[in-house]
Amino acid sequence: WRYPAAFFRQLQNSLLMRLNPEVIEKAFLSQKTGRTVRLFVDGDFKDVATLKMFMELCKARPDLKVYGYSKSWLEFVKLDATGYSWPSNYLTNASSGSRHERTGLANAFLGLPVVRGDFLAVKVDKAHINKRAYQDKTKAGSKEYRRDVLAKLKQIQTRAFACPGNCGNCLPQGRHACGSKYFAGVAIGIGIH
């Protein structure tokens, strides 16, 4: 973990999910009207029941725009197989590095209505990482870093977008590419750091 605060938030939330999920539910439901919410730091849902709980919370707050990243592809596919009706205000990104990446499950997951597309980590010049150009588009070297990411992504997929690193800072008016239906099928990527 690069950032201890993020680790401890994840630890706290993991414990709350096991011991007192009502606290998580209450916090989610108390979000300000119309907010964009990034759900789950790591995107890994423990099981289908946890995934369904969060999807039901999204349905309870249709005014929110909720998005996330997941490697829990099997849980999504299992929930979908039950005939589950997904919330219209939620999108997830298929995070690279899933253990299901090179299986038939990848196509099933990518075909779900709540999956925006791939979120890929690509190898870039270490100089970009050393300068921390991946953290924000205002950082020195960010344009060069994003150009490098985009070039690598386009080797994989023609429709691609390089993440500048700071959620809500990539599109005008604080919009999030990873949570936008307009970016459906577009590979969004970052440099491995």
Where are these regions (language model features)?
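Class I S-adenosyl-L-methionine
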Residues: 1-193
